[in-house]
C-alpha cells in the first residue's frame, strides 16, 4: 500500500531481464493507502513494466468495501465482523455492479467513484495481453488484504490460470531431460542451509520440484 521498495526493485528487475512473469498483489487495502492509480504508476516508472489491474479497490482503510473484478464484472464485498485468534473475520459476498444490494454497501460517493474509475480503466488503461504477461512486460495487479485473507484466493486462482506450465529441466550430471509431467518425483536442490539451530546438527535442503508430486512426510534420496 506504499511505494515500491528497493528489495522489490532488485528482484523484479531480475525477473524483467529474464522475461519472467511478474504478478503484483497490493496488500493492506483495509488500511489507509495511496491512490491506486499512483501505485500502478509507481510500479511502471520504477520497474519499467506496464500494469493491468485485474480487480479494483473500492475505498481504503476504514472505508474499504471490497474489490471490483474486471473479468466477471462483479463486486467482491469486504465486511469485517470482529476478530478470531487475533485475525479479522471477513465475509465475502459477490454482487453485480448494478445490484441494488450495493446501495446498502456503498455510499453514493463511493458508488459513483467506482463507476467513474472503471469507465476510465476500460477506456484508457493498458489492454490485457497474455503474451506480454508471459514475457514479463505486463504485470497483472490485484488488490486485497492478506491479513484477512481477502482477495488472496482470486489472486492464486488467476496465478494458476495464467502462468505457464513448468519447463523441462536438463540434469547437469547425466544430461537427461527431466519431463515435468512424469510421475517419478525429482527436484533440483539449489541451496543447503546447515546449523540453523546450534542445539542440533541440522541441514535443510531448499529445492525446486522438477517432476512428480511432493507429499509431506515423504522420503527422498539426495544423489550427492
Where in this protein do the model-derived segments appear?
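Canonical P-loop GTPase G-domain recognition
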Residues: 31-89, 138-156
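Single conserved hydrophobic/aromatic residue that forms the stacking wall/gate
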Residues: 1-5, 10
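Anion (oxyanion) recognition and catalysis
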Residues: 16
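Switch/coupling subdomain of P-loop NTPase systems
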Residues: 80-109, 119
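Active-site glycine-centered loops adjacent to acidic/histidine catalytic or metal-binding residues
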Residues: 27
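Conserved catalytic-core segments of large NTP-driven translation/proteostasis enzymes
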Residues: 60-65, 116, 123-224
Amino acid at each position: 500500500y506504499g511505494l515500491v521498495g528497493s528489495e522489490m526493485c532488485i528482484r523484479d528487475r531480475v525477473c524483467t531481464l529474464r522475461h519472467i512473469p511478474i504478478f503484483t498483489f497490493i496488500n493492506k487495502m483495509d488500511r489507509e493507502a495511496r491512490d491506486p492509480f499512483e501505485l500502478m504508476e509507481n510500479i511502471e516508472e520504477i520497474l519499467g513494466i506496464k500494469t493491468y489491474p485485474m480487480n479494483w479497490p473500492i475505498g481504503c482503510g476504514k472505508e474499504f468495501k471490497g474489490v471490483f473484478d474486471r473479468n466477471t464484472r462483479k463486486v467482491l464485498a469486504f465486511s469485517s465482523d470482529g476478530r478470531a485468534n487475533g485475525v479479522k473475520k471477513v465475509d465475502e459476498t459477490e454482487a453485480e455492479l448494478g445490484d441494488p444490494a450495493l446501495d446498502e454497501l456503498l455510499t453514493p460517493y463511493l458508488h459513483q467513484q467506482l463507476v467513474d474509475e472503471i469507465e476510465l480503466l476500460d477506456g484508457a488503461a493498458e489492454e490485457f495481453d497474455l503474451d506480454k504477461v508471459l514475457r514479463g512486460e505486463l504485470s497483472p495487479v490485484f488488490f486485497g488484504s492478506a491479513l484477512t485473507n481477502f482477495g488472496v484466493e482470486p489472486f492464486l486462482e488467476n496465478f494458476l490460470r495464467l502462468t505457464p506450465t513448468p519447463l523441462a529441466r536438463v540434469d547437469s550430471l547425466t544430461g537427461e531431460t527431466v519431463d515435468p509431467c512424469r510421475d517419478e518425483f525429482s527436484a533440483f536442490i539449489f541451496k543447503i542451509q546447515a546449523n540453523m539451530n546450534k542445539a542440533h546438527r541440522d541441514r535443510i535442503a531448499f529445492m525446486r520440484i522438477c517432476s512428480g508430486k511432493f507429499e509431506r512426510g515423504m522420503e527422498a534420496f539426495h544423489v550427492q
